[in-house]
Amino acid sequence: MNLQKISKKIDFKKGAGLIPTIIQDFCSGEVLMLAYMNKESLEKTIETNTTWFWSRSREELWNKGATSGHFQYVKSIHIDCDGDTLLIKVEQLGPACHTGNRSCFYTTLI
């Protein structure tokens, strides 16, 4: 499937051009992080086979692992039933979280 066909399946309008993207470990199923993608970051993710996101605070694209070396290699990309959320299954090199934890979801509330 080409990039145009993929982009047409995704509703970027609901979130002002951004869609929440869940990153999950391909082998274990562990949820590693949540980030946001725009159309350009999704295209770069598909082209490079590594995850790219839109930083809402810095207002720029970023390639996960470009600074730390903790790249996420894309194994599969899934879309939810409403077309407004992505699930990307990855092979994670090193920790996913900037704190050094494997997952960003390391704090238990209940």
From Swiss-Prot:
Protein name according to UniProt: Phosphoribosyl-AMP cyclohydrolase
The EC number(s) this enzyme carries: 3.5.4.19
Gene expressing this chain: hisI
Keywords, ordered alphabetically: Amino-acid biosynthesis, Cytoplasm, Histidine biosynthesis, Hydrolase, Magnesium, Metal-binding, Zinc
NCBIfam families reported for this sequence: PRK00051.1
Record GO cellular component, one term: cytoplasm
Predominant location: cytoplasm
Any one Pfam family match given in the protein's UniProt record, by short name: PRA-CH
Family per record: Belongs to the PRA-CH family.
InterPro entries: PRA-CH, PRib_AMP_CycHydrolase_dom, PRib_AMP_CycHydrolase_sf
